[in-house]
Swiss-Prot record:
Similarity field: Belongs to the G-protein coupled receptor 1 family.
Any GO BP: G protein-coupled receptor signaling pathway
First-listed, main subcellular location of the protein, grouped into a coarse class: membrane
Function: Receptor for ADP. Coupled to G(i)-proteins. May play a role in hematopoiesis and the immune system.
Transmembrane segments: 33-53, 61-81, 101-121, 145-165, 194-214, 238-258, 282-302
Cytoplasmic side: 54-60, 122-144, 215-237, 303-336
Membrane topology qualifier: Multi-pass membrane protein
Name of the gene encoding the protein in the UniProt record: P2ry13
Pfam families: 7tm_1
Listed name of the protein: P2Y purinoceptor 13
Gene Ontology molecular function terms on file: G protein-coupled purinergic nucleotide receptor activity
Keyword Cell membrane attached: yes
Amino acid sequence: MLGTVNTTGMQGFNKSERCPRDTRMTQLLFPVLYTVVFFTGVLLNTLALWVFIHIPSNSTFIIYLKNTLVADLIMTLMLPFKILSDSRLAPWQLRGFVCTFSSVVFYETMYVGIMMLGLIAFDRFLKIVVPFRKTFVKKTAFAKIVSISIWLLMFLISLPNMILNKEATASTVKKCASLKSPLGLLWHQVVSHTCQFIFWTVFILMLLFYTVIAKKVYDSYRKFKSRDSKHKRLEAKVFIVMAVFFVCFAPFHFVRVPYTHSQTTNKTDCRLENQLFLAKESTLFLATTNICMDPLIYIILCKKFTRKVPCMRWRTKTAASSDEHHSSQTDNITLS
């Protein structure tokens, strides 16, 4: 077993030497795009932080939203390191820091956010499908325990990726895989497959939850013969959240497995490896834009949030006067 791991490690290192990475796109275009996402994310998530500070954590829904915000803020703070590293505006030592710490934290918080979005879908599912049934999963204590468990799980999974590395040099930091020890390469592959499992499990569950929610809402509208534009917009909200989740995260997870395989074996053609690298970076950027999308989800799903946003208070009060006739199932889509 150890011999196999050592061989894999040497293969990954040797391939780094014979297959130089094409970084023209990642060095010129992506740093500019990430800079735009960074400043937009700082603006939106700072506003969201200010709003959530003024909202008590008295429901499971709010707790999940706040944890999503924390994950997004940490992801946002990791972006400057990637921008400076990819653009080659910083010394090679920063690249070593990115490989061993900031990118690990970035991925850790991304999957925390993914699981939190799954819990938000589960929370909406319970409130609409079984709104009056009392169960422990609706208690704030449950939400806090689950949230802490998720953070702890991802930390424990990610920690070896920070530790199982060789000494950084100007040559080894060109590819993060070359910086990893043989055991680190093996662990990185295990983590990659684990994260794939997390994403697709959450996605399938979200799809089931929102399908049932949509059916419930549709049945409610049909029962009360209500087909006005307000009801149609509420129907659409269910699918907007699902669409954002899929568009941001699915492409990256289609690419990640073959990319990780290309980094941990010596069987991938050099040209294909560079194509997979570019595909991974492109879809990773798409996944990163989720830090700008989540604040929109807060506005769509949480009226407590919109009531605290200064520019939306008047709109919320105006809309409230026309919402009195809506059913409780419809309200549960947007109320916490």
